[in-house]
């Protein structure tokens, strides 16, 4: 465990970029070989839009990274945060508790709030407009949402009292998890269900991308599935019934044109339909 801590304490930016690219490339190949759905779409054009948004997220996160670093350093120096108040324990348990709490505050909580607060939903719905969810969809976030999520990540680091090595570890796991859960891949049903008791599985997250309520407002988890089960936001829908997108933006010109996607948060919002 000490070696892992040492690695993430000094992980180069090049390694983080390599993990991002390698993950997308790996799942891209797998979903071509074993697709969950056979989409009739221009895969490269679709990927281009999502990769553009991924790049804007990377730029925003790198530009604001010093805030995250300063927050973590302050928490450690001032013995502030949940982890700093816990008694001595094994490093493995310390890391697990920290990752769970970062996942709760920096991912699950912000995701739920984005669905409940109309102003934040304006930005987050861009992620849901994708009717061809694949591994490139994982970081399909409007730049405005990237700033919102960064703010909650910083809040999570402060409340948890997380050292930076743990933040980098969480972000690395999160990247791979996001690519995995969005990938258009087929897993054996029993395996997917088994995984969903511990982590967010592909089919579990695909339910969240169903185009209509109440399924859109379920399965908010990022890495760990415990939060959806604990807070009653877990839902199941057979994959055969899943239709991707958001019911108010199902037309191709709505969800497959970059210019329009960037403008949607500032346009008059359309009322959702409830089944």
Predicted regions and their residues:
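A membrane-cytosol interface segment of integral membrane proteins
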Residues: 242-275
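Loop-to-helix transition at the N-terminal end of transmembrane alpha-helices
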Residues: 15-19, 42-55
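Membrane-interface helix-loop junction between the first two transmembrane segments
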Residues: 28-47
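Membrane-helix interface motif
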Residues: 66-78
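Membrane-embedded catalytic scaffold of the fatty acid hydroxylase/desaturase
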Residues: 53-64, 68, 83, 89-243
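Hydrophobic core of alpha-helical transmembrane segments in multi-pass integral membrane proteins
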Residues: 19-29
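Short, strongly hydrophobic alpha-helical membrane anchors
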Residues: 1-13
């Amino acid at each position: 465990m000490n070696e892992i801590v040492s690695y993430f304490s000094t992980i180069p930016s090049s390694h983080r970029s390599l993990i991002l690219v390698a993950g997308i490339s790996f799942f891209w190949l797998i979903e071509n070989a074993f697709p969950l759905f056979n989409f009739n779409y221009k895969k490269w054009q679709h990927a281009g839009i999502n990769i553009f948004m991924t790049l804007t997220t990377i730029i925003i996160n790198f530009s604001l990274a010093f805030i995250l670093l300063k927050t973590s350093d302050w928490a450690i120096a001032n013995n502030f945060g949940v982890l700093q108040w816990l008694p001595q324990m094994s490093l493995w348990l310390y890391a697990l508790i920290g990752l769970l709490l970062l996942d709760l505050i920096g991912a699950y909580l912000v995701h739920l709030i984005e669905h409940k607060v109309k102003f934040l939903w304006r930005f987050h719905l861009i992620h849901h407009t994708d009717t061809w969810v694949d591994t490139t969809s994982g970081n399909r976030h409007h730049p405005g949402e990237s700033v919102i999520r960064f703010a909650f990540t910083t809040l999570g680091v402060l409340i948890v009292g997380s050292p930076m090595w743990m933040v980098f570890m969480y972000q690395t796991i999160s990247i791979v998890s996001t690519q995995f859960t969005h990938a258009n891949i087929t897993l054996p049903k029993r395996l997917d269900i088994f995984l969903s008791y511990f982590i967010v599985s592909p089919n579990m997250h695909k339910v969240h991308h169903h185009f209509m309520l109440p399924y859109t407002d379920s399965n908010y988890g990022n890495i760990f599935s415990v939060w959806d089960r604990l807070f009653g936001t877990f839902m199941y829908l057979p994959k055969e019934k899943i239709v991707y997108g958001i019911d108010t933006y199902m037309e191709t010109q709505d969800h497959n044109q970059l210019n329009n996607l960037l403008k949607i948060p500032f346009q008059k919002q359309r009322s959702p339909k409830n089944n």
